[in-house]
Structures are given as structure tokens and as C-alpha cells.
Amino acid sequence: TAWCEGFYYKPRINFELLKEHHEGLICASACLGGEVLQNLLKGDYAKAKETAQRYKDLFGDDYYIELQDHNLEDQKRTNPDLIKIAKELNIKMIITNDSHYLRREDADAQDTLLCLQTNADKDDPNRFHFPNNEFYIKSKEAMRKAFSWMDDETFEECVKNTEDAASKCNVEIELGNAPLPHYDVPEGYTNETYLQHI
């Protein structure tokens, strides 16, 4: 359904569809683009808290407040409110890093790929780009450095919660077989003609 009905640049679903299919899923409040953080960025703490409560009501202990620190001002501004929401609603916190490349030194290669993907010139100041080179897979030590503002006890609790959430996951990726969405081909079409039609 996300591919066929909710597609907007990427597959997505609405809350009603999520309610229908939430069993067995783990949910986190997400990055700055997530619903909770978008409300905080708009200055609406009450709406952010209400949104977090709605997800907690649906997912129970499988809902987490996700903290990130990529040295961005918006994260520095909203992380304290996320922690406050987590404490007020008794939601476990996890720490993650939005990872778009393997190592810090891969940032320039990722930037070049973004230019190719978006057909942009690298010297265009208005093109989409990541604001810094912090979007890589970080070690626990690098995460501790990023979260140096957090006390040790809270940091270790967040690490444990992150590991607990990861341990609930069971994913097997079959290489060489792209997971394409299933769709029904209406009568009167072949696979090829229906693809051309849509």
C-alpha cells in the first residue's frame, strides 16, 4: 500500500494504516523530519507530547524516543524537550546516528552521489546537501563524544535501550533479489503495458 497509494518521493503510510499493521513493529520518534520533532521545531511542545503519547499508546514498550546529535542547532534545541517528553510519558530513549555513509571520510563521496541523484552542480549553494560530515556509522566512543553533554548514567541507559531495541529485530536480506512491491495487473494489460500506463 505504501508503494501504490502513499508514495510521495518515497513509500509512506498514514497513522490509520500504521494502526492496522503495527503488530511486530518497533517505532521510534525519528530524526528532525519526524512528527514529534517537527512539532517541537514549530514550538508546539504540547502537540509533540500528544504525538509521542499517541505512538506510545499504539506501540507500548516498542516505542522509543530517539535522540540524535549531529552537531546541529535544531537538535541542540530539541533534545532537552525530547528527554523531558520521554520522562513525562515514561518512554524509553535510544540514541542513534542518521547514517548515510560508512565513515566520516566518505562524506564527500556521498555529497557527489547526491549531486548525481538530484542533477545538481556541486558548487550550487542552493542544492540539497548534508550540513556537515557527521552522518556516518559511529562507534560507541564516537557516540559518547557526540553526546558529551549527556550524563554517563543516561547515556548508558540509552545505549542499553538501543541494544534492546536492536535485539528485537530479525532481518535477513537476500542478496541479488530486489524486494520489489507486488501489484496486480488489471485485465487488458501486460506487465509492460501497465507499467507504461502508470
Q: Where is each model-derived feature located?
A:
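Phosphodiester-processing cores and adjacent nucleic acid-binding clamps
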Residues: 1-198
